[in-house]
Amino acid sequence: MRPDTADFRTLFLSGVAMLDVRAPLEFARGAFPGAVNLPLMDDAERHEVGLCYAQKGQQAAIELGHQLVSGLRKAARIAAWAEFARAHPDGYLYCFRGGLRSQLVQQWLHAAGVDYPRVTGGYKAMRGFLIETTDAAAAEQQWFVLGGLTGSGKTDVLADVPAAIDLEGHARHRGSAFGRRALAQPPQIDFENALAIDVLRHIDAGWRALLVEDEGRFIGSRDVPQVLTQRMQASPLVWLEASFDERVERVLRDYVQGLAAEFIAEKGSTEGFEAYATRLREAMAGISPRLGGARYGKLSALLDQALAQQAERGEVDLHRGWIEVLLREYYDPMYAFQREQREARIVFRGDRAAVTDWLRAHTAQRG
C-alpha cells in the first residue's frame, strides 16, 4: 500500500484525484478543484452524531455513527469508495482533520480488499498550506499588474502571457457591474483554494514575475485575499491601450454575444435568452444611481431596442449604441481618474502586441 502523505505541495502540483469523505454541507462550504465528495455520513447523520458527542462524549458518538452507517447503507458507501479508488489508483482520501472519519473509511476499504492512502491532517491542513502559499507569494514574488480602460482586452493579454493568473476566471466574474456570468460564482473558499493552487503552479514553473489584472478588493461578491490586494496596489502597472472602436467591439463580443451564448448553452434558446436579457437589464439598473435618471432612461431604452432586435433577428448591431454611451460617459471618466492616481506606477504602456511582448520578456522563466 502507498503510504499516507502530508506532502501537500506535491499533491496540488500533481493534481492527483482526491476523495473527500466530509459531509456534503462541509464540502459545499469549501473544497479543492476536482475533489469528489463521497461522504462517510450525510448531513443529517453527521448532525445526529455531533449532538451525541456534545451530550454523551466521543465513544457514544462513535457507536451511534456505526449504527447509522451500517448494513446496505454501509455497503453502498464502501462500494462507491472502492470504485473511486480503482478509477484513481494514484489518489488520496481525506476528512476534515485527517482523524476518525478518514481512518474509518480507510479501514473499511481495507476490509473490502482495497488499500487507499489518506492525507495526514486532512482538509484543514491542506487549506492552511494554501493560505500560507498565497501569503508567501504576495510577500516574496515579483508582480506586475495589467490595467486599461474597459474593453481594452486585458483578459486577452492574460491568455497570451504564460505567467498570468486570471483572477476573474477563478472568480467566474468579469469584475464590473456587467460582469456576472451565466454560472454562479464559486464559494469564497473554493475561489481562494483554486487561486492558491494556480499561484503554486506558476511559482513551480519558475516565472521571474507573475501577472494579474488590475482589480479592486472584490470581484463580484468574491473577496480577493487581502495580502494579494495590498501587493497589487504596490506593484508596477502596465497600461494596455486600444482604440475606442476596438473597445466597443470587444465589449460587444464579451458582454453581449459571449454572455448570450453562455446563458443559451446553460438554459436553452428561449429561457437562456430571457435570462441573458434580464441579466443585462439588472446590470444597467444596478448603476442607475450613478448614471442619473435621464441618462439611465436613455441607456435603458437603447438596451431594450437592442435586445428586441437580437431576439427577433439575431442581430447585435444596436447594442453598440448603449455600449458607446456607457463607455464614453461612465466607464472612461472613472478609469481616467483611477489612472491619474496610479500614473507614477506605470512602467510601460502600449497596444496589445507591445504589451504582450513586454510582459513575456519581463516575466520569462528563470535560467
Curated annotation (Swiss-Prot):
PROSITE patterns: RHODANESE_3 (PS50206). It is an enzyme of class 2 (transferase). Its EC number is 2.9.1.3. It comes from the Bacteria. It catalyses: 5-methylaminomethyl-2-thiouridine(34) in tRNA + selenophosphate + (2E)-geranyl diphosphate + H2O + H(+) = 5-methylaminomethyl-2-selenouridine(34) in tRNA + (2E)-thiogeraniol + phosphate + diphosphate; 5-methylaminomethyl-2-thiouridine(34) in tRNA + (2E)-geranyl diphosphate = 5-methylaminomethyl-S-(2E)-geranyl-thiouridine(34) in tRNA + diphosphate; 5-methylaminomethyl-S-(2E)-geranyl-thiouridine(34) in tRNA + selenophosphate + H(+) = 5-methylaminomethyl-2-(Se-phospho)selenouridine(34) in tRNA + (2E)-thiogeraniol; 5-methylaminomethyl-2-(Se-phospho)selenouridine(34) in tRNA + H2O = 5-methylaminomethyl-2-selenouridine(34) in tRNA + phosphate. SMART domains: RHOD (SM00450). The active site is at residue 95. Keywords: Selenium, Transferase. Gene3D superfamilies: Rhodanese-like domain. One of its GO terms (biological process) is tRNA wobble uridine modification. GO terms for molecular function: transferase activity, transferring alkyl or aryl (other than methyl) groups; tRNA 2-selenouridine synthase activity. Residues 12-135 form the Rhodanese domain. The keyword Transferase applies. Belongs to the SelU family. Involved in the post-transcriptional modification of the uridine at the wobble position (U34) of tRNA(Lys), tRNA(Glu) and tRNA(Gln). Catalyzes the conversion of 2-thiouridine (S2U-RNA) to 2-selenouridine (Se2U-RNA). Acts in a two-step process involving geranylation of 2-thiouridine (S2U) to S-geranyl-2-thiouridine (geS2U) and subsequent selenation of the latter derivative to 2-selenouridine (Se2U) in the tRNA chain. Monomer. This is tRNA 2-selenouridine synthase. It comes from Cupriavidus necator (strain ATCC 17699 / DSM 428 / KCTC 22496 / NCIMB 10442 / H16 / Stanier 337).
